[in-house]
A protein has these predicted regions:
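ATP-dependent carboxylate/phosphate-activation module, predominantly the ATP-grasp catalytic core
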Residues: 1-56, 79-101, 123
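A short glycine-rich, hydrophobically flanked beta-strand micro-motif that places a catalytic Asp/Glu
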Residues: 58-70
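Glycine-biased flexible loop/turn sites that connect beta-strands or occur in inter-domain linkers
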Residues: 15, 70-71
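Surface-exposed helix-capping loop/turn segments at secondary-structure junctions
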Residues: 54-59, 108
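Peripheral (often C-terminal) accessory segments that flank ATP-dependent C-N-forming ligase machineries
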Residues: 68, 98-128
Length: 128
């Protein structure tokens, strides 16, 4: 019924949240985001951090939330992996791969705040 959000989250090995990058799914084709907007939403970020800590998740997590008929956000998916649109977060300035590698190598990691951008993904036909 309402707006759908995908949120990329990274947590350290103690389930402490390092970053959350929410994005509105403005258009999808066959379940894949083709238009998205990175947004700043403290409520969404807190909800994601809370559920990830409760579940003791670690590493890269991809969550999806959707507004119900009353506009209330509900979790619809929690995936312990990179999502298909995680690259959108990288385009917004948050390099998830670098953060994960730093965590694995026990290095101090720098986490940038995401740039609030819109992204459009295009597919091309290829004839061989």
């Amino acid at each position: 019924p309402g707006m759908e959000y995908t949120i990329d989250v990274v947590l350290d090995d103690q389930s402490n949240p390092l970053v959350a990058v929410p994005r509105k799914r403005l258009q999808t084709k066959e379940g894949i985001s083709t238009k998205a907007e990175i947004v700043k939403d403290d409520y969404i970020e807190k909800m994601c951090f809370d559920i990830c800590k409760f579940l003791k998740l670690k590493g890269s997590i991809c969550l999806q939330m959707k507004e119900d008929v009353n506009g209330k956000l509900k979790f619809v998916e929690i995936n312990p992996r990179f999502g298909g649109g995680t690259y959108f977060s990288t385009l917004a300035g948050v390099n998830f791969m670098e953060i994960i590698l730093d965590l694995l190598n026990k290095k101090t990691t720098k986490v940038n705040s995401p740039n609030l951008i819109k992204i459009m993904r295009y597919y091309n036909e290829v004839v061989i």
